[in-house]
């Protein structure tokens, strides 16, 4: 029961007491859960997934304490049932999924783990959800597919390798189809499903709520339908974004409330709406959401921070333009070109992402004022900050053996290896000759080939004396091979006349072709000699003519 005691310590942070002998007596459920979850942990989706078995329940409790998620009533009784929930959009968060599950009357959620792409940390569209009772799992499998989540009906399946591979294949097909179509992945809707939650710095691919500007993904509609902004006006910290054209100035914030400044730029002026700008997910060629009003441009990923706030303008504002001015920073394509689709997530200076988002794909908040490098340039040596490769021991690449072979040998070691190679060579030649004289040419050839490979693999194979041994073995091998071919044809001739005649014809043909080949080369050499003789005669004639002229 040592394992059970360990699991009691692990789940102590959940805050629920349960009887160890009565309800947690066997290891079948834990072993089965480990076997089911181990492929997803080794799937290489995210580095933090490898040890999430030990940290899942504490992290769930911490998330409930930190964020503003709905109240979760844990009725954990020592039983855990894992389900896969798929057919989700890539911007679906754990809050969205929790709200959908709670709407069905299921309140014993133990964990929610999203599967993510290793390349960009983006959700693959399915998650692992653990509940604490069989009734909750049945209710999820029966009722959740009938609910609509971001315009799509979720798919609930048991947790096994078959459904995991199906969801993986579906996510790969979706990614490949999005890349081949050239449109990029559609942005999330305008925030109707997220307006019910306060801006809590959680979610997948969302910008922090402190940055003004309404929806930061003004892209085309995804599978969930066109974006709608029905509840954006409920957020007091964001002025509404008007239709294309010069919008009117919004009202000031309520008394006693201060607009928090954005993390990577100057604070927004309260007398004008935020300027529109193209963001990831907006297709190429789509006009901006409106003309640029005067004021500092918002930060754009990959172009550095904007230049500081402008001085107070006493006169008329400058004419609005369709594009924001380019801030100082590394040059790149025009701002109308959307960045590559593999760069989702918060901009530089955003708060840390949600627990199911890999934090290695986002820069720390401390570097919010430092211009980031251009995302379209060559990547650094290790863009994701992975540790150096660990030592694999006996299964490492052969480079270590080559390095060991390059190390200088002492005279005693050299002589020992050389004597061993000489013994191998002499014994192999004597055995091969005896086998060949007995007619066992296959064994003789195999002996010589093995001896040659052993000597070539030794540490002194580059030495001239070792090369002499190898050449002597190869000469012996060629002689035995030629002898074996001739004896084989004689044996065939003595056994079957038809085969011997065909072999004889082929040998005659080979001998004729060899003779023709030799004759051809002889004729070529004769031609060369003739040409040389002609050249010599010409040179002599020229020398004679020169001597005659000089006289």
Curated annotation (Swiss-Prot):
Residues with the Phosphothreonine modification = 157
Q: A single GO BP annotation from the record? A: positive regulation of RNA export from nucleus
Q: Which residues form the RRM domain?
A: 81-161
For whether the record's keyword set contains Iron, the answer is no
| Polar residues bias locations | 169-180
State the Gene Ontology terms under molecular function: mRNA binding
Q: Where is the composition biased (Basic residues)?
A: 504-514
Keyword rRNA-binding belongs to the record = no
According to the UniProt record, list the residues that bear Phosphoserine. 494, 500, 511, 513, 525
User: According to the UniProt entry, which residue ranges have a biased composition of type Basic and acidic residues?
Assistant: 389-404, 489-503, 515-551
Name the keywords, alphabetized: Cytoplasm, mRNA processing, Nucleus, Phosphoprotein
Quote the Gene3D superfamilies the UniProt record gives: 3.30.70.330
Q: Which domain of life is it from?
A: Eukaryota
Q: How does it assemble?
A: Component of the cleavage factor Im (CFIm) complex.
The protein depicted here goes by the name Cleavage and polyadenylation specificity factor subunit 6
Organism name: Gallus gallus
């Amino acid at each position: 029961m040592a394992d059970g005691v360990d699991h009691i310590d692990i789940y102590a942070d959940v805050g629920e007491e349960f009887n160890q002998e009565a309800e947690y007596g066997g290891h079948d459920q834990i072993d089965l859960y480990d076997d089911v979850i181990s492929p997803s942990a080794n799937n290489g989706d995210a580095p933090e997934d490898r040890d999430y078995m030990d940290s899942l329940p504490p992290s769930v409790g911490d998330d409930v304490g930190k964020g503003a998620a709905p109240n979760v009533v844990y009725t954990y009784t020592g039983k855990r049932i894992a389900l896969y929930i798929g057919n989700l959009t890539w911007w679906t968060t754990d809050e969205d999924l929790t709200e959908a599950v709670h709407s069905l009357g299921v309140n014993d959620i133990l964990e929610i783990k999203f599967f993510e792409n290793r390349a960009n940390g983006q959700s693959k569209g399915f998650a692992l959800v653990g509940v604490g009772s069989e009734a909750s799992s049945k209710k999820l499998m029966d009722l959740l597919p009938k609910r609509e989540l971001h315009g799509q009906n979720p798919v609930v399946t048991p947790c096994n390798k078959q459904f995991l591979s199906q969801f993986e294949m579906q996510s790969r097909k979706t990614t490949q189809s999005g890349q081949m179509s050239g449109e990029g992945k559609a942005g999330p809707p305008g925030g109707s499903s997220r307006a019910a939650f306060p801006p809590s710095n959680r979610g997948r691919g969302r910008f922090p709520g402190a940055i003004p500007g309404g929806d930061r993904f003004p892209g085309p509609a995804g599978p969930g339908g066109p974006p709608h902004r029905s509840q954006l006006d409920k957020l007091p910290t964001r002025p509404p974004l008007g239709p294309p054209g010069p919008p009117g100035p919004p009202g000031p914030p309520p008394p006693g409330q201060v607009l928090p400044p954005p993390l990577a730029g100057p604070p927004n002026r309260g007398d004008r709406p935020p300027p529109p700008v193209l963001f990831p997910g907006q297709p190429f060629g789509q006009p901006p959401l409106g003309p640029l009003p005067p004021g500092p441009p918002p930060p754009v990923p990959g172009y550095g921070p904007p230049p500081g706030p402008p001085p107070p303008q006493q006169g008329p504002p400058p004419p609005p333009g369709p594009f924001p001015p380019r801030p100082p920073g590394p040059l790149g394509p025009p701002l109308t070109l959307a960045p590559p689709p593999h760069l989702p997530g918060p901009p530089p200076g955003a708060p840390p992402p949600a627990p199911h988002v890999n934090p290695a794909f986002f820069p720390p908040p401390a570097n919010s004022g430092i211009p980031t490098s251009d995302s379209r340039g060559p990547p650094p040596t290790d863009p994701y900050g992975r540790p150096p490769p660990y030592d694999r021991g006996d299964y490492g690449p052969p480079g270590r053996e080559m390095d060991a072979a390059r190390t200088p040998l002492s005279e005693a070691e050299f002589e020992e290896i050389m004597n061993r190679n000489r013994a191998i060579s002499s014994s192999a030649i004597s055995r091969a000759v005896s086998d060949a004289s007995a007619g066992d040419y296959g064994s003789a050839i195999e002996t010589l080939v093995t001896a040659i490979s052993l000597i070539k693999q030794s540490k002194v194979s580059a030495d001239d004396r070792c090369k002499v041994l190898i050449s002597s073995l190869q000469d012996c091998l060629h002689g035995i091979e030629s002898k074996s071919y001739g004896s084989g044809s004689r044996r065939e001739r003595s056994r079957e006349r038809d085969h011997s005649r065909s072999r004889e014809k082929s040998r005659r043909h080979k001998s004729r072709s060899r003779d023709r080949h030799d004759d051809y080369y002889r004729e070529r050499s004769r031609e060369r000699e003739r040409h040389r003789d002609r050249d010599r005669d010409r040179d002599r004639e020229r020398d004679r003519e020169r001597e005659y002229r000089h006289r």
